[in-house]
């Protein structure tokens, strides 16, 4: 079961149900777990997630495009934020410090990430220094104070995970243990024909072992997609053990897939490299998860990492 937002009249619901304000129930389906992009290529917001839209507790997200000289200003309020530079260069002025020429890669397939973490109560202004500048922002409620921090490409640990055609690259932007309260953020590259988030895993219940060690966290997750060619696509399945949720989504450029619970593997179409940016928040600042026992055996069959990895590296910057 999953707790619902405090504004809901319900307290706890079966895993397959989300609460709809104003009454009624709605099952999680491919139609409400996939947010299709309406990007026109113009400046402005081209992907957006709210807790109201997702019917969950924590994650907000917006991806926006700015041309050179355009600015996006706001205040973190009672939230902690991460701004991930998808492409281009910007200047960021905040009440917690100023950051000049943030960003370097022209797009996510051409370099490692820059990002900025801001805690609550911070005013900020992001000004694009290049045309077509793109930034993805995520924010969650917080009741703690943490220092602002610029994350550079050298700060993002790179992991080549899996094996054979289940190989992928993970860049940790805000990993577990980062000086924040709830946010976790990684970006993942999956070469064409490969699987990622595989074997399927879940993080939808908070569990500790007999020694008190966390073995699974209850986390909401956003998948924000980019493909290296505009016609590319990936498939993502979200399902629970009892199949009360079993949804298959075709994800294209700038689409968002919501993972409120359940297992959630991805496969990238042959010929196209899939990128997704993951934001997570929930019961712990963690990535603790549990594999689907039906598929965990595949790990024993891996013999090596796909030679197409890494897709991006510090050498590109």
Feature locations, PLM:
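Extended, compositionally biased flexible segments
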Residues: 53, 60-128
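Conserved metal-binding segment of the jelly-roll/cupin
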Residues: 109-123, 127-128, 250-271
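Conserved hydrophobic/aromatic beta-strand scaffold that supports enzyme active sites
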Residues: 61-65, 115-117, 137, 185-189, ...
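Low-acidity, Ser/Thr- and Arg-rich intrinsically disordered low-complexity segments
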Residues: 1-12, 16
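A short glycine-rich, His/Asp/Glu-containing loop-to-beta-strand
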Residues: 39-73, 80, 164-221
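Double-stranded beta-helix
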Residues: 132-171, 239, 277-317
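Short, structured patches in soluble enzyme cores that scaffold and shape functional sites
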Residues: 120, 128-130, 137-141, 174, ...
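Glycine- and acidic-residue-biased ligand/ion/polar-headgroup-sensing regions
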Residues: 77-100, 192-193, 205-255, 261, ...
């Amino acid at each position: 079961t999953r707790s619902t937002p405090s504004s809901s009249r319900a307290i706890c619901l079966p895993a397959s149900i989300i609460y709809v304000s104003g009454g009624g129930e709605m099952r999680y389906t491919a139609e409400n777990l996939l947010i299709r992009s309406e990007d026109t290529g113009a400046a402005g917001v081209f992907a957006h997630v709210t807790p109201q839209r997702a019917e969950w507790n924590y994650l907000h997200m917006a991806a926006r495009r700015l041309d050179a000289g355009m600015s996006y200003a706001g205040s973190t309020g009672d939230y902690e934020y991460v701004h991930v530079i998808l492409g281009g260069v910007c200047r960021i002025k905040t009440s917690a410090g100023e950051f000049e020429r943030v960003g370097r890669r022209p797009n996510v397939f051409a370099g490692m990430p820059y990002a900025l973490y801001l805690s609550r109560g911070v005013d900020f202004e992001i000004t694009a220094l290049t045309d077509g500048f793109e930034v993805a922002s995520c924010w969650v409620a917080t009741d703690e104070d943490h220092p602002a921090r610029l994350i550079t490409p050298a700060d993002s640990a790179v992991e080549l995970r899996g094996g054979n055609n289940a190989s992928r690259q993970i860049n940790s932007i805000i990993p577990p243990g980062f000086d924040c309260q709830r946010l976790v953020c990684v970006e993942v590259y999956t070469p064409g024909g490969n699987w990622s988030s595989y074997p399927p895993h879940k993080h939808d219940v908070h569990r500790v072992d007999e020694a008190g060690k966390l073995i699974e966290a209850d986390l909401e997750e956003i998948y924000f997609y980019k493909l290296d060619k505009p016609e590319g696509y990936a498939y993502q399945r979200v399902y629970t053990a009892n199949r009360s949720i079993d949804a298959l989504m075709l994800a294209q450029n700038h689409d968002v897939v919501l993972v409120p619970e359940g297992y959630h593997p991805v496969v990238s179409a042959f010929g196209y490299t899939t990128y997704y940016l993951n934001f997570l928040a929930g019961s712990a600042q963690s990535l603790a998860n549990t594999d689907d026992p039906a598929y965990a055996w595949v790990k024993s069959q891996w013999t090596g990492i796909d030679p197409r990895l890494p897709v991006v590296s510090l050498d590109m910057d």
